[in-house]
C-alpha cells in the first residue's frame, strides 16, 4: 500500500473518486442517516479499493450497472484516528454503489433536539467535516487529494429546509423508485414517501475536497444582504438574523475586493449560515454556504473579519487545497494573508495591523504550548499517528502568514500580487503539497532561495528571525499599556476611549499569564470585561482570572462554557482550569464538562476530553 495521506486508508496507486451521488434519509428520531453512495472513479479498476469510514454500517455494495453484489470486507479493528477501512474488490468497474447507515455518534454530525433550538419546536442537524470527518457521513476516500463533484437527494421532514455547500436544485415530493436501494438498509419506500417528508436536491459542479461537504437542516430563514449573498439563521431567531444581516452588510464589497486581488470568484454564491452556539469553529469555508458561529456577531462590524477569512478561502484553500493535513499551512497561511489584504482595503490599515498583532501574540503563545512537541511548530510537519483535531493551532495560520508576508516583503507587493494571481490560476481546483509550492515559487521568482531560507521557514521549528512583528502607533501604544499593567498601572479611560474588541483583545493577550487577584478585579470593576458581549474579550479576561486564582469569576466561567461550543473559547478556559488551577478549578472543569458535554459538537467533545485527560 502506498498511502497518500497519513489520515486516510486511500492508496495512491488506486484511482481516485471524481463524483459522488448521495441519497440520504435523515431520521431525527434516531439521529441516523440511511443512505446510498454512488462513487465514480477516475478510471476502471480491478483489485482491492480502500475506502474510509467511521461508525458506518454497510448493508451492501453493488455494481450500479448490473446491480450484482460486489465483494467487500470491513476491518474488525478500527484505527483510533482513521476509523474503519472498507476494502471493496472490484473487477474492472469504474463505479460502485454502497448502501449504508450512519451512527448516532457520527463525528461530523450534531443533532439538536427541539429544546436546543430557538423555537423549541423543531430539531436541527449540521455537519463539520474538516479535518477528517466526512467519512462518518458517507464512505469515501476522505483525503483532500481526492477532489469530488457531488449530487445529493436529501429526504427530510417537510417542516424543515436544507442548505448545502452546493447549488440548490429544487424542493419536491419524494418518489418510491428513489428508495429501492435503501430497502436493503431497512428503509422502505413507505418511509421515504411519507406524507410528512419532502426531498431537497443539490448539486456541486466544481471539484472540492471531501472536508468541504456540508449541510444543515432545520427551520431556516434568511435575509438578502447582497447580489450574491443571503444570511441564514433559524427562522425563529429574528434578533440574530437581523443582527447578522447588519454585521455582514459589507460582504459584497469584500467579494469585489477579493476578485481584484486574486481573480474571479469561481463559486457563484457566497451565502452565510449562522449556526447554533454549539458550532465548534468561528467559521467554516464551505463553498457557496459558509458556516459561522453566532459569537462573531459583535454589533460593530468586526465580525466581518471572520467572513473575510472564509471568503479568502474561496481562492486559497478551496480553489487550491493542501494535499493532506501535513501541509495545512498552504490553506491557512495564504488565507490569513489574503484575509488581511481584504481587511486592509475595506476596513483600513490600522485594523489590519491590529489583526497581525493579535496573530503575532497568538503565534508566540503556540510556541510555548508546543515547547515539548516542536514538530507542531513546523509549517510542514509529520502527522503519522496524530489526530489533526488534537494539534489544531494558530501555527499554520500565523507562521504561514508570516512566511507569505516574508516573500511579499522580499519582492515587493506589486510583484507579489502578480505571483499570487499566477499561483492561483495555475493550481486552481488542484490539491498540492509544500514542495510543489516551493518549486513554483523558485521557478517564478528566480533566486528567491538565496534571499529567504525556504527550508528553515517550511521545515524548521519555532519562529524564524526574519519574521515580522507589526509596527503601528496603536499597536505600540497597546503593548506599552500592557507592560505598564505589570507594574500596577491600569489604562485610563482616555487611553481606552476609542477601543473596540480588537484593541481589548490585544491588550489582554499581552498581559502576564497571571496577575495579582486584586489587580484583575480592579481592571474588571472599571471596564466590565467579564460581562463583555464580545467573546474574544470576555474569554481572554476570564482566562486571566482563572490563572490568577480569581475564584469570584468561576460562575461566569461556568456560564460561558455552557452557552458556547466554539473551541477557540473552550480550549483556553478548560486548559486554564485543568492545567493552571488547583483542586477547586479542576473539579469545576470536570463538573462543567459533565453538564455541558451533550451540547457540544462531537469534535469539541473530543478536544475537551483530551485536555482533561492530560491535566486531570
Curated annotation (Swiss-Prot):
Q: Per UniProt, where does substrate bind? A: 128-130, 282-286, 566-568
**Has the keyword Nucleotide-binding been applied to this entry?**
no
An example GO biological process term is: leukotriene biosynthetic process
Q: Which Pfam families match?
A: Leuk-A4-hydro_C, Peptidase_M1, Peptidase_M1_N
- Localization, UniProt: Cytoplasm
InterPro entries (UniProt xref): Aminopeptidase_N-like_N, Aminopeptidase_N-like_N_sf, ARM-type_fold, LTA4H_cat, M1_LTA-4_hydro/amino_C_sf, M1_LTA4H, Peptidase_M1, Peptidase_M1_C
Binding residues annotated for Zn(2+), in chain numbering:
309, 313, 332
Keywords of the record, alphabetical order, are: Cytoplasm, Hydrolase, Leukotriene biosynthesis, Metal-binding, Metalloprotease, Protease, Zinc
At the top level, the lineage of the source is Eukaryota
Q: Name one GO cellular component term.
A: cytosol
Catalytic residues at: 310, 397
**EC number of this enzyme:** 3.4.11.-, 3.3.2.10
One GO molecular function term of this record is: metallopeptidase activity
* Broad class of the protein's primary localization: cytoplasm
Co-factor(s): Zn(2+)
Q: Which reaction does it catalyse?
A: an epoxide + H2O = an ethanediol
Instruction: Describe the family membership recorded for this protein in Swiss-Prot or TrEMBL.
Output: Belongs to the peptidase M1 family.
PANTHER family named among the record's database cross-references? LEUKOTRIENE A-4 HYDROLASE
Task: Spell out the protein name for this chain.
Answer: Leucine aminopeptidase
Gene from which the chain derives: LKHA4
